């Protein structure tokens, strides 16, 4: 059996009881470590806490391992119980859907244990979940690569009065361009996690490029950091205001606010930007 288990967003205690039972009876436990992170990141202490709480050694699975060697994990699940741990909910990334398809194609039983994810946890700010349009991803810009396909999606959402959840880039164990060119042993860039501030800077750059007045410095947004953890940060304000806020450690995400209901506005007041945020 292959168990794909959502861990939630905070720490090791956010796993569901059903998920914990599945982990404890698994012979091997992998943890996906590139589409999201728990509040402690990838620190050795954090991983040790997970292993103590779950009572199992945990193998960190980076992007290369999951996308290139998933077959080995699936083979192990033919005759054994194998757990694959995912921060948030298992289907927050297409990679995990692919894993299910491959396992079922080979006749391996799959059981999914759901949990909270950023997709529903953003509801804490008071913006109603059914009032969101398509979610977009904001990638890190480079000197030669500045993709902006998210702009048209935000434009469509705003034309319909809908809120837009922006998921911000995470770059963990990414090979350096130089090592890819050389071939042989790969060298990796240090981890990078996009901040709300960087996301807004890039969004405004794209707006300036297109000039369709989809959003601007005065557009209302909500910035989030470390959703689901005890020290989560939530601030509502204009893009210009949020660009100067210190949201602290990752992970961050951003919501561009659409048309609001009075109840939504009342909730947002609790998180309103104050000078000194």
Curated annotation (Swiss-Prot):
GO terms for biological process: methylation; protein histidyl modification to diphthamide. The keyword Repeat does not apply. It is an enzyme of class 2 (transferase). Pathway: Protein modification; peptidyl-diphthamide biosynthesis. GO terms for molecular function: diphthine methyl ester synthase activity. The keyword Methyltransferase applies. Keywords: Methyltransferase, S-adenosyl-L-methionine, Transferase. S-adenosyl-L-methionine-dependent methyltransferase that catalyzes four methylations of the modified target histidine residue in translation elongation factor 2 (EF-2), to form an intermediate called diphthine methyl ester. The four successive methylation reactions represent the second step of diphthamide biosynthesis. Belongs to the diphthine synthase family. This is Probable diphthine methyl ester synthase.
């Amino acid at each position: 059996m292959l168990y794909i288990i959502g861990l939630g967003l905070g720490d090791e205690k956010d796993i569901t009881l059903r998920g914990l039972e599945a982990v404890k009876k698994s012979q091997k436990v992998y943890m996906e470590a590139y589409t999201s992170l728990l509040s402690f990141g990838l620190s050795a202490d954090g991983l040790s806490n997970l292993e103590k709480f779950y009572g199992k050694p945990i193998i960190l699975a980076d992007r290369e391992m999951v996308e290139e060697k998933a077959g080995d994990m699936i083979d192990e699940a033919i005759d054994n119980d194998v757990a694959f741990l995912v921060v948030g909910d298992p289907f927050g990334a297409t990679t995990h859907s692919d894993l299910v398809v491959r396992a079922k194609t080979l006749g391996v039983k799959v059981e999914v244990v759901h949990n909270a994810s950023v997709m529903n946890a953003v509801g804490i700010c008071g913006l109603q979940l059914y009032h969101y349009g398509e979610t977009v991803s904001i990638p890190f810009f480079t000197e030669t690569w500045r993709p902006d396909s998210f702009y048209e999606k935000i434009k469509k959402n705003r034309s319909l009065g809908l809120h837009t959840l922006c998921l911000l880039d995470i770059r963990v164990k990414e090979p350096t361009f130089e090592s890819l060119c050389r071939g042989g042993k790969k060298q990796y860039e240090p981890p990078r996690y996009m901040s709300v501030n960087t996301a807004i800077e890039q969004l405004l750059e794209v707006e300036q490029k297109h000039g369709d007045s989809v959003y601007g410095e005065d557009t209302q947004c909500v910035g989030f950091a470390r959703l689901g953890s005890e020290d989560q940060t939530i601030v509502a304000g204009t893009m210009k205001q949020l660009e100067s806020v210190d949201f602290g450690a990752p992970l961050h995400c951003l919501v561009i606010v659409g048309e609001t209901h009075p109840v939504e506005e009342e909730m947002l007041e609790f998180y309103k930007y104050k000078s000194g945020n």
